[in-house]
Each structure stands twice: as structure tokens, then as C-alpha cells.
Amino acid sequence: MEPNVRFWITERQSFIQRFLQWTELLDPTNLVLSIEKIEKSRQLLLTNEDASRGDLEDKRIQEAWKRSLSTVHPDNSRLIPGPFRPAALLPFTAPTLFLSMLPVKSLKSMILPQASFYTYSTAFNIVNGNASYDRRAHESLLLGAGVIVSSTFLGLFPRLLQVRLSMNSVLSRNFIPVIILAQLSGMNVIASRSLEPMRGIEVMDKEGNVIGYSRKAGTKAVKDTATSRVVLFGTSAFIPEVFAYFFKRTQFFLQNPWSLWTLKLSCTVLVMGLMVPVSFSVFPQIGRIQCNELEKEIQSATEETELFYNRGV
């Protein structure tokens, strides 16, 4: 069985345990691990099938799990490219999220931040989605391009209305864009991973044996991930806006107007730094689903009452 799958199936963790786990896996040093170190860690886990995260006495196994879980895709055992590993989400999206929420001066000034944000989000969702179903490279490229264009357009649309209609109320200027950003982040996951509910993803028993391909499991995997992304980006955009709203009423802001952008950027990074592990921990990495909720052909293929699938990140 793939070590990462074995880990997430056997380690039945609570939300708090998953959160603490992700704070380790999101260590920025995981972005620059050498292939040699990762391969050595994987070999150690493959030759020690009984190794668990609870082996506190063996620091080598602890480090091996950290490297494997943070760099290797559980479906195909391939290395995740550095820029799209879970630890890369914060440094790549926090700056573009901040720029996307700046006041609109002209529509042109908003195109690059929006396009950058949704380009990276789409690529991240595709790379870290479920990879157990059959898909061709050109399908992913065409799907990704379409999702990027549509997400960017929908993200720019409310900004266009602001410019054309001169909407300057606090609600339309600060909080409606947050709501739209949160919803588009969830829709981006659904669109970029739309092949999973269409073709079905692998479901397996507790030993890792593949029972079949389920469209219902694919739908649940995408829905749960989309929900977590709404929580992540909605909260990360909303809290800085609230802080900025009250900060602009202080004497300090009146004397130092430039400090507003420093506050918003710092707040965005801090909130995202907390919300990334929170959002990744809302649902287990390897999801569980009752067999009677799946397709008839899968129910007839096993006597297990509970099956597992990779939800993706």
C-alpha cells in the first residue's frame, strides 16, 4: 500500500490532531527538499510497514513521514512539484489575495492580481486533486485554461460595476468583493476538478485494495475541498477588511495614511498563516464513506461497510 494512504487510513485523527499535523507539513523547508532525501525517506517507510507517526523514539521515522506526506501525491506516488506543494499555498496566494482586495483605481490595475490568483489556484487544485482516474495532459490543460479565464472574468465583474457605477459604499467597496472571492474560490475547485465526479475516483478498503471507481465519492471529495477553500479565502479576505474598517477611524491612521496597507498586508499573511492549516484540517485527507452510499456495482463488489478515497488538498 502507498505509505501516505496507509498513514491517513490508520491514523484516525481528530480535527486538532490534523491541525497539528498540518502545521508540520506546511513547514517551508519542505519546498526545497532534495529528491535524494525524499527517496530515502520513502524507502524507510516502505521497508517499515508497521511504522506509525506515534513512533516518538525514532526521529528518522518522524522525519520520513513529514517528508513523504508533504511532497508525494498519495494516488500515484509521484513527487508534487515544489511550487504546488501544500506548503507553497501561503507564499504564492497571500500577496495576490492582498492585491486583489485593494481599492479599484482602474480596471487594468485589477487584471493582473485577479489573473495571477486564479491561475495559481487552478493549477494547485488540479495538481493536488484526486489523480486516480484516467485523464490526459491536454484535458487538464484545456480545463485549466477555461477555469482560469472564467474565474478571472467573474472576479473582475463586480470591480467593473464599481468603476462604472461609482459604487462607494462600505458594503459594495469592501465586503461584497469578499463574498464573491470566497464563492469563486469554491467554484474554482469544483470547476478545476470537475472530471472527478464525472469519471469517478478510486475507493478502497482499509487494506488499500481498490474496489472500484465511484462518481459519488468524487462528488463528495470535490464538495468537501471546495467548502474548505471557501473557509480559507473568505476568512483571509474578510478579517483584514474588518481591521482596516476600524483602523481608518483611529488618530494614528489620520497621521500615517500609508500604514493602512502595511496593516492589511500583515493581517492577510497572519490570518492566512492560521487558516491554511485550519482549512486543510476541516476534512480528513483520506475520506471515509459508507458503502451503502455508493453505486450498486461497488456495493456488490465488497462486504466492507466503510470504504476510503483520497479527498485531495
Swiss-Prot record:
The keyword Manganese does not apply. The keyword Transport applies. Pfam families: SFXNs. InterPro entries: Mtc (IPR004686). It is a multi-pass membrane protein. The chain crosses the membrane at residues 87-107, 141-161, 175-191, 230-247, 269-289. GO terms for molecular function: monoatomic ion transmembrane transporter activity; transmembrane transporter activity. One of its GO terms (cellular component) is mitochondrial inner membrane. Keywords: Amino-acid transport, Membrane, Mitochondrion, Mitochondrion inner membrane, Transmembrane, Transmembrane helix, Transport. It comes from the Eukaryota. It is found in: Mitochondrion inner membrane. One of its GO terms (biological process) is mitochondrial transmembrane transport. Belongs to the sideroflexin family. Mitochondrial amino-acid transporter. Does not act as a serine transporter: not able to mediate transport of serine into mitochondria. This is Sideroflexin-4.
